[in-house]
Amino acid sequence: MGEEGFLAHFAFSIGGLPITQSVLTTWFIMISLFIMAWSTTYKCSLLQPSTYQLIWEGVLSTMYDAIKEVLPEHVELIFPFVATLWIFILVSNLIGVIPGFYSPTADLSVTASLAIMTFLSVHWFGIRAEGWREYLKHYIKPTPFLLPFHLISEISRTLALAVRLFGNIMSLQLTALIVLMIAGFLVPIPILILHIIEAIIQAYIFGMLALIYIAGGIQAHELKSQGESL
């Protein structure tokens, strides 16, 4: 699993720009997921779907239904983002069980990037759904004095997203390393099962929190608009 730290270890540099293990693994995951998505859609068939296609359809249908339960009115708008987030984080969490690979989500810079992207998406989808004027009015209602508190709330939950995922994945890998150092390879299967379960749970939690934040932003503005129109 390699050694973990607050930042991924340096691998090499390109033009003075440091490339870390987490960056390399992230590139590998992105390329792999792109190839998998392309191969699935390229060979997609309505009459004779392959087992591979049925598996992906089942996974995406489950995600779609989960998002629809939270935000049915805007499911088509936010489904691509949340589903991509779920899949990427899950693969990033799981790849650490493969010898020689480093889990990008055990790197604080990666989880911070995901949290910032989620933070931006909350406002992007809110503006798409309500318009930028109505959306921004929320931060100064009922009084402009609440603006600093709204900003603090947005920043704090973004930090919480980043630190939560990073802390859980890094501690999981460190725990597995310590157990393997003490017990050797007598208990690899329980450790592997624990890693897989935790990886799935953390990906689900991060994706659901992102979904709830997006839904909360959109619905809060819709409720305010409805209340003002009454």
From Swiss-Prot:
The keyword Cell inner membrane applies. It holds the Pfam family ATP-synt_A. It is found in: Cell inner membrane. GO terms for molecular function: proton-transporting ATP synthase activity, rotational mechanism. The keyword Cell membrane applies. Coiled coil: none annotated. HAMAP family: ATP_synth_a_bact. Key component of the proton channel; it plays a direct role in the translocation of protons across the membrane. This is ATP synthase subunit a. The gene is atpB.
